[in-house]
Design a protein with these regions (language model features):
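C-terminal edge-of-domain segments
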Residues: 129, 133-141
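A structural signal for small-residue-enriched, beta-sheet-centric alpha/beta enzyme cores
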Residues: 1-105, 109-131
């Protein structure tokens, strides 16, 4: 994100799994633009309504991700395997050619959760990146 927007270090806040703290802070301290960027698993948790994304306090909803895969046209076997998956990385791998479409759906739902927590004065972008730092999805803003 820093390279994309040519931002100085002080323009970035690394909140880790505590995006909820950021979202609770912003209504009283509004900013014009917020980009929430992270990996697929963290943002799948946000898409599921979790504001604390730490692994000890929230889990990826494999059933919901399986339903998203079904909506994207995945076959029943892939959907069933996704619903039984041990983690988000496995589900993303099962998505195959639908990987980016699934990431876009997750990013869009995560954005809806973030917008619901804010006052509406902040434009919200959600970006999902892979382990190499490449974008899988970007929505909003």
């Amino acid at each position: 994100m820093q390279r994309l927007y040519d931002l100085p270090d002080h323009a970035l806040i690394d909140m880790g799994g505590f995006v909820g703290g950021t979202l609770k802070y912003l209504p009283a301290h509004a900013v014009a633009w917020l980009t929430i960027a992270g990996g697929f698993a963290k943002l799948a948790k946000l898409a599921g309504g979790h504001l604390d994304l730490h692994s000890a306090r929230s889990r990826v909803d494999a059933s919901a991700l399986g339903a998203m895969l079904a909506a994207l046209g995945a076959d029943d076997k892939a959907v069933d395997m996704a619903r039984a998956a041990a983690g988000a990385a496995e589900i993303l791998a099962l998505a195959g050619s639908r990987e980016r479409a699934l990431a876009r759906l997750v990013a869009a739902r995560a954005r809806e959760v973030a917008l619901a927590a804010l006052s509406g004065e902040t434009a919200v972008e959600v970006a999902i990146v892979d382990r190499e730092g490449e974008f899988l999805a970007r929505v909003g803003g």
